[in-house]
């Protein structure tokens, strides 16, 4: 498993190389897309990126949790969380890549 983390700058570099925009324009485009995704989620809208994933805001009820160090119970207040559900196409690409790597390692 790789430990590489893709950053905004990495995404901007890819856009710069593949689309032909300047690095500044590419960074602005990446920022614009990410801002729109965030704004949609803040408004409570689901964001579906076909063949990639769906991001959705979900409400979680209040519940009782436990401090792992002390074992003391404490209420966890209700909150809203973002969920990520990978599309089947993305899941399959990841699985295929994993299988190909395993096969290569066996040879």
From Swiss-Prot:
UniProt keyword Endoplasmic reticulum, yes or no: no
Descriptive protein name: Integration host factor subunit alpha
Sequence similarity: Belongs to the bacterial histone-like protein family.
CDD domains xrefs: IHF_A
SMART domains, A to Z: BHL
Record text on subunit structure and interactions: Heterodimer of an alpha and a beta chain.
Keywords, ordered alphabetically: DNA recombination, DNA-binding, Transcription, Transcription regulation, Translation regulation
Gene Ontology MF annotations: DNA binding; structural constituent of chromatin
BP term (GO), one: positive regulation of metabolic process
Keyword DNA-binding among UniProt keywords: yes
One of the record's GO cellular component terms: cytosol
Purpose: This protein is one of the two subunits of integration host factor, a specific DNA-binding protein that functions in genetic recombination as well as in transcriptional and translational control.
């Amino acid at each position: 498993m790789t430990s590489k983390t893709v950053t905004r700058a990495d995404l901007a570099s890819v856009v710069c190389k593949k689309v032909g925009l300047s690095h500044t324009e590419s960074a602005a485009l990446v920022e614009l897309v990410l801002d729109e995704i965030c704004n949609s989620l803040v408004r409570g809208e689901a964001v579906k990126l076909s063949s990639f994933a769906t991001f959705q805001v979900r409400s979680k009820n209040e519940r009782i949790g436990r401090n792992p160090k002390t074992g003391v119970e404490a209420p966890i207040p209700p909150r809203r969380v973002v969920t990520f559900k990978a599309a089947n196409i993305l899941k399959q690409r990841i699985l295929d890549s994993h299988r190909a790597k395993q096969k290569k390692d066996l040879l």
